[in-house]
Amino acid sequence: MQPISPGAAVLVVGAGITGRAVLAALAPLGARATLTDDSPTALTASAQQRVEVLDPATAVDRIADFDLVVVSPGIPPTAPIPVAAAAAGIPVWGDVELAWHLDRSGRFGPPRQWLVVTGTNGKTTTTSMLYAMLQAGGRRAVLCGNIGDPVLSQLDRPADVLAVELSSFQLHWAPSLRPEAGAVLNVAEDHLDWHGSMAAYAGDKARALTGRVAVGGLDDAIAAGLLADAPAPVKVGFRLGDPGPGEFGVRDGVLIDNAFGRDLALADADTIPVAGPVGVLDALAAAALARAVDVPAAAIAEALATFHVGRHRAEVVAVADGITYVDDSKATNPHAAQASVSAFPRVVWVAGGLLKGASVDEMVEATKDRLVGVVLIGRDRAIVGNALSRHAPDVPVVELVTGEDSVVLEKDESGVTRVTRVIQTGDRTLADAVMTAAVDAARGLATSGDTVLLAPAGASFDQFTGYGHRGDAFAAAVRAAIR
């Protein structure tokens, strides 16, 4: 029996947004879907909606009853259900793999052109730029994937092209995906706890490069290596410098297509509304994907000139007393934080959170000459502090400790000029207390001409509900402080 033929038994793992999209997609196919989730509350709510449910332990025991397992992207391959399915020879798909099969089947009309964006950092901005370029070029396009709506939920919309942001998790569970064009922007340490190794992480990213056109960042050693090894018949690199044959790049301040055109000018780099080199790289990658499906240069220029940066992505919150306050809470790993700090000449860096096993030494070494002060927050702040002591011992540091997380305070290495402040939350939430103290400390370190930059280099879930919550708390604290 084919995995998604009528009557097929499908186990759906995860009752969140993705799981609900999978259930909705399976219903008209005649498949028999069963939902499992670690949350008994979620299973009870689903059962009340007449969804067949199983607890995870029972699902493992009965894994042989299923023809297909569809997992939410956060489920690692080492989880009990994927392990049991693999041992039983049962295919395990993600929602993107299911969407790919359904789109290729013609169930929703002629198959779309998939343009896929992945990378450790810059995915959302690049995919958004790509979508704007497609729209400016008159294409019927849909923006989907990790950026918001699951691909599955968008297949019934009239479209010729899908601009799809995909994470390494989603790519891991999409082995058959062959996009019209796909880009790997960059690859740096992230999610190693999920993938198990850097090689496995990079290998999953490389699945974006298995279609007709592969696009890769040449200024990133790992991305460039993945591009060189890609099976795609057309390979296109992009770089900040002068582009060679088959490349996109920058010449005399102008974005140039030397791959699908011959030294074709696309747009002035100074029209890109994302600060620093990272904005130029994102625009080059988006332009390469757009040009792969024949979007004209004029449409690319129009899209970049009118593009708006998303929330919490190098977003200027305020300027007061000559100090610029920037929310880049989306910089949730050291690679992203390095790019963020590198966009400004003098930075008071607000950093910390959950590093997920990543090292910050390379990032601190690369940006130390830009740092005029550092404010450390969050669970792994001592790791950042120790990196500062090794590579930037003259930079003043204020470390913020709360009663809630002081248990994880580690012994600091000597060398850093460090002040430790214990936060008292009082009647405030932890998030408000942390950011109020962080902004107060940062203002004390900054002078006119400096940038106070929230670019944490870590995930937010130790003290906030997400990077958006963290950024909102920062912005609120800034506005309160400068009144």
From Swiss-Prot:
Pathway: Cell wall biogenesis; peptidoglycan biosynthesis. It catalyses: UDP-N-acetyl-alpha-D-muramoyl-L-alanine + D-glutamate + ATP = UDP-N-acetyl-alpha-D-muramoyl-L-alanyl-D-glutamate + ADP + phosphate + H(+). Transmembrane segments: none annotated. GO terms for molecular function: ATP binding; UDP-N-acetylmuramoylalanine-D-glutamate ligase activity. It is found in: Cytoplasm. ATP binds at G119, T120, N121, G122, K123, T124, T125. GO terms for biological process: cell division; cell wall organization; peptidoglycan biosynthetic process; regulation of cell shape. Its main location: cytoplasm. Keywords: ATP-binding, Cell cycle, Cell division, Cell shape, Cell wall biogenesis/degradation, Cytoplasm, Ligase, Nucleotide-binding, Peptidoglycan synthesis. Its EC number is 6.3.2.9. GO terms for cellular component: cytoplasm. Belongs to the MurCDEF family. Cell wall formation. Catalyzes the addition of glutamate to the nucleotide precursor UDP-N-acetylmuramoyl-L-alanine (UMA). This is UDP-N-acetylmuramoylalanine--D-glutamate ligase. It comes from Mycolicibacterium vanbaalenii (strain DSM 7251 / JCM 13017 / BCRC 16820 / KCTC 9966 / NRRL B-24157 / PYR-1) (Mycobacterium vanbaalenii). The gene is murD.
